[in-house]
Amino acid sequence: MIKEITAKYDAEQIEKKVTQFWEDSDAYRKTREHRKSGKRLFFVDGPPYTTGHIHLGTAWNKIIKDSILRYYSMNNRYILERPGWDMHGLPIEVKVEGVLGFKSKKDIESFGVENFIEKCKEFAIKQKQAMTEQFQRLGVWLQWPDPYMTLKDEYIEAAWWTLKQASEKDLLEVGKRSVNWCPRCETAIADSEVEYSERTDPSIYVKFRVKGEENTFIVIWTTTPWTIPANVAVAVHPAYEYSKFRAIRQDGSEEILIAATELIKNVLKQGRYTDFEVLETMLGEELTKLEYESPVGDLVPVQNEIKHGVYLADFVTVENTGCVHIAPGHGMDDFNLGAKHKLPILCPVGSNGSYTEEAGEYAGKNVKEANPIVIEDLKARNRLLAEGTVTHRYGHCWRCKTPIIYLATEQWFLKVTEIKEKMLEEIDAVDWYPDWAGSARFRTWVEGARDWCISRQRYWGIPIPVWKCKKCGKLEVIGTKAELLEKAGLNGDIELHRPYVDRVTVPCECGGEKKRVEDVFDVWFDSAVASWATLKFPQTRDQFDEWWPADFITEGHDQTRGWFYSQLGASMVGFGRAPYKSVLMHGFTLDAGGKKMSKSLGNVISPLDIIGRFGADTLRAYVLSSSAPWDDLKFNLEEVETIHRSINILWNVFRFPLPYMALDNFDPMQVSLDSVRDALREEDRWILSRAQSVVKSVDEAMSGYLLHKAVREILDFTLEDLSRWYIQLIRPRTWTEADDPDKLAAYCVLYEVYVTITKLISPFMPYLAEEMYQNLIRNVDPKAPESVHMCDWPKVNEAYLDTKLEEAMNTARSIVEAASNARQKAGRKLRWPISRIVVSPESEDAARAVERLRSVLMDQTNSKDIVLTGVGKSWDELGLEVIPDPGKIGPVFKRDAGKVVPALQKVDGFALKKAFAEAGEFELTLADGSTVKVTPEMANFKETLPEGTASAESDAGPVYVDANLTPELEAEGYAREVIRRLQDMRKELDLVVDENIQVSVRIEDERVLKLVETLKGLIAEEVRADVFDIGSGVNVSGDLVKDWDVEGIAMKMGIAKK
């Protein structure tokens, strides 16, 4: 049977209880098995790094996923939903280095690669377990015992297989290129891994002396002085105009400079020149005949072996000088220009960011620390035109936050540029939510994509499966572990991580020995193969053929250049199509002011702290309802508290009828809604219709992943329609006899609505839904599904839908609100009855609504009658005051104006308005008996209310409240005041609903006493008093005695338990 619940919503206790129930009943496994015959849905979880505690962003991400997957499950989808874990790469290595106190790769080498690998593995596995428990605490249901983990050999093989496909399709390339490089981690990093932030760097203008011309210089600008020792060329734009001009200083010294014509003034200003003379102008293409000297040739001997020239490039812009310093070893554009013209790829910098011996006098110095040294050397050689600083957005390593540099190194690349057009076609074949996530943001990223550098010079990652012969240099790509064991002639098993796999050699046809190249995969390549790796492909095709590609994925908008992109690229290589059918892109979590959360700002909020304070369901409901999924979430604690209050209201809504239902032994299995259909009131039919409308709205919202609209719809319905309206309407019906059909109808309707709402909230607030389901449904129907999450999603019952009734109730509620506003103006509280409400409807629909819901209106306005005027008609008891306009009267009547104004004020307003309408004028008799004619512009009109009434506007039209009191109304008003206070005292004594009491009331005001005595029986019935003593000299006693001030009348009341 239905049981009472606690008065207070206790999230911690409920969630502990429900978690235990789920574990004891094996609810997740059974729920998934329950849907095995349903339509398949393949979901791929974007794997978080196993680096520690979950944060608000990862919590929001998993809550979005869980809510959508629960919704799909209830719609009979059989879901493959393995959680994923990214367990390799710099994110893990940097954490382990921190634990071990390491500062560089040298420390790792000294420690031992094998030891380091084992530490990384141990760390990743330990953190995975901790994070699993944290996600489970959020109420997230996934196949937690069977996750996919990137460190497993079966997963590694999926990456190997994909690379072999690239090799076979001629999409794999090895070569020297200038790449993003982290000097602390000593590895290449991808474009998508570069994080940009504000940084102040040197800003210098440098003079390169032109060979064969006296005192003539090309002027370049750079923010990286440390790259000057690697300069090999200058780039200019072929179509820009350049000038050779004499620049003169105040002391009379002069130099001949070359720069873009448009930028001469900037160069003069930077160099503090006072005058200039243009000697010659030419297009950029005419400068290519020039050669120049390195400004640091005496310090960097290798510079003297290079022929420095001017080359054309479209990437040059009209900024600073229009001449760009080119160092192919330290920039992608520079490298490409150098490769085009076969320029030397000078890169005198090592992997740790320090100059090599090739840098001459700078050897051994860290490049960033060398900036001021280079500047001083340029100054000493009179090659520094100007120096300053610039604050700009500069790239940093995504994991250790070290400023990146560009280094020309040998790397492995996927030739994305060769499949880019097909990738763009596949983007159009995917359903994107919102649409612009694919059609704009993602498309733009892919259009600008370069070949993907997939190699990293690190340790803890998937080893690149390329074996190279030491003797002949032949390369071989291995696709699986079995293939490697066979070619190596090994029996048994090996682990596919470094350094174990590095020990495996493969014989070469030339008689030499092939060893694995040392690089590991870019960690984004790990997760790129998730959709087939999680299906255990290529070991077996069974699951792959049944499930692939993914039906749905969702991640943050940063993944347009991360996981969305890497998956698409790898899948195009492996299968020639996108690995997903639909993608939901969500936003970032920010603080309330819109700033990124960071420890340095002290604005980080832990989801676990929020759960500890408010519970998981509150956090879930908040992040889901706060904004559209693709908008950034500005986390606001006050809004969390508001949602928590809403859930408390939801709890109280559920709790409200339970004591009465339990007391009456109400059994919804015995009393159906059909059996009480004839006893249904209009408000019952309305709430049934509203519940169906909510189901429809939530379904529509979920079809477009508008989770915020879905959750808001449910909470608004609970708060506005159930709590603030329907429950207020039916409250008196719950106090009647147990077998009263009217009461049973209210019970059945509430039960029906509660069952619907319990199912609707289950994807979003799974703990609360389960708690209510077990009490409301499982307790009365043992044949019902074991968990709410096994239930089918509610379908719209068209038989209950009545949109006309919903519109009518909206009208009625507007009238009630207007009546309440009018009561306040009249100073009459709602507890006090009034004789009538008058409504002047502005439409036939409004009039019909009033007639249809007359009893609801009378009840909710506490009025004895509802009076309707005709549609568009004014209330006939209204007066119409005439307000003369002296400004219009004065010019016409001049001296007589003083007589006209008071005479006009006395005229009947209705008669005057009628005359104006019919004749366009009115003959006014003045005090002296003379008459004048007045016209419409001379008078304004103002409605006046009868004495004791007040009005307010509603959607239906004006509403008037007659607040005049009769003795009968006053008696009822005082009686209601007494009832309210006695009920408060019952609550204070914590009495059960049906417990009878003895009441004593003393009222010394004889007039009020007589009024209250007339309704003694009503008061006794309402407060369940079988003994009720009232009088001016009554001895008030009992278990609780209180003095009250009731509308200025002193009263003493006592309650005694029976």
Swiss-Prot record:
SUPFAM superfamilies: Anticodon-binding domain of a subclass of class I aminoacyl-tRNA synthetases, Nucleotidylyl transferase, ValRS/IleRS/LeuRS editing domain. It holds the Pfam family tRNA-synt_1. ATP binds at K599. A motif ('KMSKS' region) lies at residues 596-600. NCBIfam families: ileS. Monomer. This is Isoleucine--tRNA ligase. It comes from Methanosarcina mazei (strain ATCC BAA-159 / DSM 3647 / Goe1 / Go1 / JCM 11833 / OCM 88) (Methanosarcina frisia).
